[in-house]
């Protein structure tokens, strides 16, 4: 009874207390493959060449995919579609860890071996470390196709700041910095993708934005035959809003026609 004035229990409390609830990593399916991503070693570099031949030849590997294998749109993003799902040849990496290729294999150990066999040739470029550097007129462009590094600009004016400062008894001018903060949820990000009985790709995900996951997976695959079901979420704090493994697991399932589990390591 959800009427005002009635006491209600959390809808997920029973399955959590009894241990029957499932997080994505608790899902296992017959013939399930394990996915990993080869990630950029450089925060800003141009990818010149990707050689996946040796990885594809490794026993137990079912798929090695690059940007060329994406059937829909490579670029996704919640606010603006400017984030590469997989960095293509000729494209720029944007941070340490940008995905360049994904591998699906019979087990994670084999997938990790295959990852080490992929050869990538980079042109390492100067990277941008601060907002101030990025906003400078002569800053290297983060995105080739953009005029500059300013995503949006808005001017806000409230009151008379100069007058307020002039009439203040004390005025302190200083530069303050705070450290980076990791969301540090207990559960690493994980997704399991498979074809369901309707012939749709079903993604079991642990994220905070199931509708965005659905939209961006559909965009990547070039089809609306995608479903997203949120499993239990082991913490998020805003850190599980963007795509990390969901769309890549879906892509590997699309290519292999098999269930695929993909999970970030704690280091990732």
Describe the predicted segments one by one:
Residues 1-148, 171, 255:
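Flexible, low-hydrophobicity surface segments
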Residues 19, 63-68, 95, 172-176, ...:
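General beta-strand structural signal in soluble alpha/beta enzymes
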Residues 25-26, 82, 90-93, 161-162, ...:
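A generic local secondary-structure boundary/capping motif
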Residues 37-67, 102-121, 191-256:
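Alpha-helical support elements that line or immediately flank enzyme active sites
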Residues 69-72, 178, 186, 210-211, ...:
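Short acidic loop-to-helix transition motifs that present clustered carboxylates
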Residues 85, 181-185, 244:
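Short secondary-structure boundary/capping elements
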Residues 140-219:
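Helix-loop-helix junctions that connect adjacent transmembrane helices in secondary transporters/permeases
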Residues 251-267:
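FAD-binding glycine-rich core of flavoenzymes that anchor FAD
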């Amino acid at each position: 009874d959800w009427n005002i004035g009635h006491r209600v229990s959390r809808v997920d409390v029973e399955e959590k207390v009894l241990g029957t609830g499932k997080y994505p990593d608790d899902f296992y399916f017959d013939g399930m493959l394990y996915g990993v991503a080869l990630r950029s070693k450089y925060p800003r570099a141009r990818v010149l060449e990707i050689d996946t031949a040796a990885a594809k030849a490794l026993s137990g590997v079912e798929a090695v995919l690059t940007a060329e294998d994406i059937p829909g749109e490579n670029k996704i993003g919640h606010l603006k579609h400017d984030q590469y799902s997989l960095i293509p040849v000729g494209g720029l990496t944007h941070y340490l860890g940008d995905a360049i290729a994904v591998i699906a294999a019979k087990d994670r150990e084999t997938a990790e071996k295959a990852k080490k066999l992929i050869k990538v040739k980079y042109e390492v470029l100067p990277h941008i470390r601060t907002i101030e550097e990025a906003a400078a007129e002569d800053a290297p462009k983060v995105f080739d196709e953009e005029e500059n590094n300013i995503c949006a600009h808005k001017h806000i004016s409230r009151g008379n700041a100069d007058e307020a400062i002039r009439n203040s008894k004390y005025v302190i001018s200083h530069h303050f910095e705070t450290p980076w903060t990791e969301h540090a949820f207990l559960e690493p990000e994980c997704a399991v993708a498979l074809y369901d009985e309707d012939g749709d790709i079903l993604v079991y995900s642990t994220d905070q934005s199931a509708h965005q996951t659905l939209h961006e997976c559909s965009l990547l695959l070039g089809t609306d035959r995608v479903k997203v079901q949120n499993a239990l979420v082991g913490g998020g704090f805003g850190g599980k809003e963007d795509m990390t493994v969901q769309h890549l697991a879906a892509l590997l399932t699309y290519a292999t026609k098999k269930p695929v589990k993909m999970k970030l390591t704690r280091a990732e």
